[in-house]
């Protein structure tokens, strides 16, 4: 029973890690959407710079837009994957919770004095 409890705790920790990862991805998604909105407000000839280390380097606006679009696509794919992991872990936890309840009920009905 304690082994099952430890496994259940481990699954809860894994689920929590997936949820935190999902939240980080959501933050990144929102940040990149804001950058995309900023690009929409720029004139075509407005210079765009990329921070590399401590240096701002000029980049083509089209290249910067493409990079942000690719990043958005990647983040959305990661969010989908992360959400699937969360669902799978929740299902696993629910099955284990049912097992623990059954074991608890069995132990209670066959416990001392019965």
UniProtKB/Swiss-Prot annotation:
Q: Name one GO cellular component term.
A: cytoplasm
GO function term, MF aspect, one: tubulin binding
Source species, domain of life: Eukaryota
Indicate where this protein resides in the cell. Answer: Nucleus
Keyword annotations for this protein, in alphabetical order, are: Acetylation, Chaperone, Nucleus
Kindly list any coiled-coil regions of this protein: none
Q: Which Pfam families match?
A: Prefoldin_2
Main localization of the protein described in the UniProt heading: nucleus
**Residues recorded as bearing N-acetylserine in the entry:** 2
Give one GO biological process term. protein folding
Tell me the InterPro entries matching this sequence.
Answer: PFD_beta-like (IPR002777), Prefoldin (IPR009053)
What biological function has been recorded for the protein in this entry?
Binds specifically to cytosolic chaperonin (c-CPN) and transfers target proteins to it. Binds to nascent polypeptide chain and promotes folding in an environment in which there are many competing pathways for nonnative proteins.
List the PANTHER family hit by this protein, alphabetically. Answer: PREFOLDIN SUBUNIT 6 (PTHR21431:SF0)
Cite any additional comment in the entry. Answer: Present with 784 molecules/cell in log phase SD medium.
Q: Which family does it belong to?
A: Belongs to the prefoldin subunit beta family.
Q: How does it assemble?
A: Heterohexamer of two PFD-alpha type and four PFD-beta type subunits.
Q: What is this protein called?
A: Prefoldin subunit 6
Source species, please? Saccharomyces cerevisiae (strain ATCC 204508 / S288c) (Baker's yeast)
Gene behind this chain?
YKE2
């Amino acid at each position: 029973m304690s082994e099952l409890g430890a496994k259940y705790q481990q699954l809860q920790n894994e689920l929590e890690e997936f949820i935190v990862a999902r939240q980080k991805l959501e933050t990144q998604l929102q940040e990149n959407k804001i950058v995309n909105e900023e690009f929409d407000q720029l004139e075509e000839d407005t210079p765009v710079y990329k921070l590399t280390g401590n240096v701002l380097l000029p980049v083509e606006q089209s290249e910067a837009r493409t990079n942000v679009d690719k990043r958005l696509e990647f983040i959305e794919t990661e969010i989908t994957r992360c959400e699937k992991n969360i669902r799978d872990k929740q299902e696993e936890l629910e099955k284990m919770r049912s097992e623990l309840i059954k074991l608890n009920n069995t132990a209670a009905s066959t416990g001392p004095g019965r």
